[in-house]
């Protein structure tokens, strides 16, 4: 019984197969062996058009549309743009044409619906319409300023007298004398013209780290690692006020140019604002996570700028005592800050770079590249010359406008000092900007001046070449 059932099933399958073959012969037998003709003109034209647009679009002025995901603006289709003539009734008759008349404009863009009507259009070809090619977008280089020529600087005088590292300097507003503070716990006042010692002030019990001469009072302010901030009366050469409040060493001190306000900063990670006359602590500017190593004060908001060992720079609202902006571009300790005397700009120095900033929001302007050392001090004069001094004794002079390093010098240690004592800790231009005072680790104070009768022909600066690179900071 089982064998009979299997024979019946096989007969049914054979019958079905035979019927299928007979049907296929009836349908297709008449065309067996004939060659099927296929007109691929449309496909070839589309392929050629797509490759022209992709490879030569930037030269021929091809269509640059709007990229959906990047929100690029739509551009007008140029004289060599491509278009599609579509016939809805007969899609196979559609052709792609190219306008060669340079004066003829096309209002609109290639229709995606028209392309979709063409059979066999590859997905890549759809980029012709509605999507711009990133390679076709011309990116302009940042404008590069040609540096101005500056006369080179040379050593004018070496002043000895301190018994420790010289850590700070300030020039008297009348430009007659300057003062320095050192690791020997003394403050010395020197005649600027002759370099002769005029006075030595003693009172600090640790290294003197900051000095400031008041432009409106006969006062000299000093701070040191002994946590003390002192006010000296230069008529009696004695301390008349102490400002108590810092919990650790005080590393920086600045006076407000128009207000009777004193700002100090130090190892306790805060900057303190003092009333000069009443000795009251007006504000405690807190927010830094580590030692505040540098400080700058100006007349206009933001009136206080601080740089810290936490690698940040903060711009402060002096009236409210709060942070306006925090700049996080530096990756190392910000050891130096310097304001431009005539512009609303400033510079910051660190071991990773020297950076150029613009007030009031702290906009980043660029880098001064080339001083590969730990920069301890920066100074800027009215002639757009910036000086940077480092812990290895290297000195660089920069053109402020272009950021070009036009001169390099190496400080020479004094006889009896080690080569490792070539570090530069502080610097300042005098009020004319023609003399530069540096404080160094070999216990000396050096004064530099520009070379007399220098010309671009006799004393050319370091060569400058414009860069073709797009800089990313």
Curated annotation (Swiss-Prot):
InterPro entries: G-protein_beta_WD-40_rep, Prp46/PLRG1-like, WD40/YVTN_repeat-like_dom_sf, WD40_repeat_CS, WD40_repeat_dom_sf, WD40_rpt. It is found in: Nucleus. WD repeats lie at residues 161-191, 203-233, 245-275, 287-317, 329-358, 370-399, 419-449. One of its GO terms (biological process) is mRNA cis splicing, via spliceosome. CDD domains: WD40 (cd00200). The keyword Iron does not apply. SUPFAM superfamilies: WD40 repeat-like. One of its GO terms (cellular component) is post-mRNA release spliceosomal complex. PROSITE patterns: WD_REPEATS_1, WD_REPEATS_2, WD_REPEATS_REGION. Keywords: mRNA processing, mRNA splicing, Nucleus, Repeat, Spliceosome, WD repeat. Belongs to the WD repeat PRL1/PRL2 family. Belongs to the 40S cdc5-associated complex (or cwf complex), a spliceosome sub-complex reminiscent of a late-stage spliceosome composed of the U2, U5 and U6 snRNAs and at least brr2, cdc5, cwf2/prp3, cwf3/syf1, cwf4/syf3, cwf5/ecm2, spp42/cwf6, cwf7/spf27, cwf8, cwf9, cwf10, cwf11, cwf12, prp45/cwf13, cwf14, cwf15, cwf16, cwf17, cwf18, cwf19, cwf20, cwf21, cwf22, cwf23, cwf24, cwf25, cwf26, cyp7/cwf27, cwf28, cwf29/ist3, lea1, msl1, prp5/cwf1, prp10, prp12/sap130, prp17, prp22, sap61, sap62, sap114, sap145, slu7, smb1, smd1, smd3, smf1, smg1 and syf2. Required for both cell cycle progression at G2/M and pre-mRNA splicing. Interacts genetically with the PRP4 kinase. This is Pre-mRNA-splicing factor prp5. It comes from Schizosaccharomyces pombe (strain 972 / ATCC 24843). The gene is prp5.
């Amino acid at each position: 019984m089982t064998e009979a059932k299997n024979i019946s099933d096989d007969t049914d399958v054979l019958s079905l197969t035979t019927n299928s073959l007979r049907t296929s012969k009836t349908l297709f037998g008449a065309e067996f062996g004939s060659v099927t003709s296929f007109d691929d003109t449309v496909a070839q034209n589309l392929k050629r058009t797509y490759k022209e647009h992709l490879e030569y679009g930037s030269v021929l002025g091809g269509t640059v549309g709007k990229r959906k995901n990047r929100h690029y603006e739509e551009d007008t289709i140029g004289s060599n743009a491509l278009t599609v003539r579509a016939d809805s009734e007969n899609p196979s008759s559609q052709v792609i044409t190219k306008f060669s008349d340079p004066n003829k404009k096309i209002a609109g863009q290639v229709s995606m619906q028209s392309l979709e009507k063409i059979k066999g259009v590859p997905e890549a070809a759809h980029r012709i319409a509605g999507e711009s090619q990133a390679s076709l977008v011309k990116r302009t280089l940042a404008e590069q300023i040609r540096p101005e020529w500056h006369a080179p600087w040379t050593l004018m005088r070496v002043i000895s007298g301190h018994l420790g590292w010289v850590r700070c300097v300030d020039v008297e507003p009348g430009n007659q004398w300057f003062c320095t503070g050192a690791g020997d716990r003394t403050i010395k006042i020197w005649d600027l013209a002759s370099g002769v010692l005029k006075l030595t002030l003693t009172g600090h019990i640790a290294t003197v780290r900051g000095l400031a001469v008041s432009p409106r009072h006969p006062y000299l302010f000093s701070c040191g690692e002994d946590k003390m901030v002192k006010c000296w009366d230069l008529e009696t050469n004695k301390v008349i006020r102490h400002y108590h409040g810092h919990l650790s060493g005080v590393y920086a001190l600045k006076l407000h140019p128009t207000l009777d306000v004193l700002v100090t900063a130090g190892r306790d990670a805060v900057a303190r604002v003092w009333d000069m006359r009443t000795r009251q602590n007006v504000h405690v500017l807190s927010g830094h996570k580590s030692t505040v190593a540098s400080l700058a004060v100006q007349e206009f908001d933001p009136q206080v700028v601080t740089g810290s060992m936490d690698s940040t720079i903060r711009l402060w609202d002096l009236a409210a005592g709060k942070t306006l902006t925090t700049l996080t571009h530096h990756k190392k300790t910000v050891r130096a800050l310097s304001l431009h005397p005539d512009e609303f700009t400033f510079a910051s120095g660190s071991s990773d770079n020297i950076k150029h900033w613009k007030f009031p929001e702290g906009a980043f302007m660029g880098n001064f590249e080339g001083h590969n050392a730990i920069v301890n001090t920066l100074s800027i004069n009215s002639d757009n010359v910036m000086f940077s001094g480092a812990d290895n004794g290297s000195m660089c002079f920069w053109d402020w406008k272009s950021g070009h390093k036009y001169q390099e010098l190496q400080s020479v240690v004094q006889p009896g000092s080690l080569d490792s004592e070539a570090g530069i800790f502080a610097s300042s231009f005098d009020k004319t900007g023609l003399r530069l005072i540096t404080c160094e680790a070999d216990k000396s104070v050096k004064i530099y001046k520009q070379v007399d009768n220098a010309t671009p022909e006799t004393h050319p600066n370091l060569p400058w070449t414009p860069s073709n690179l797009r800089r990313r900071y």
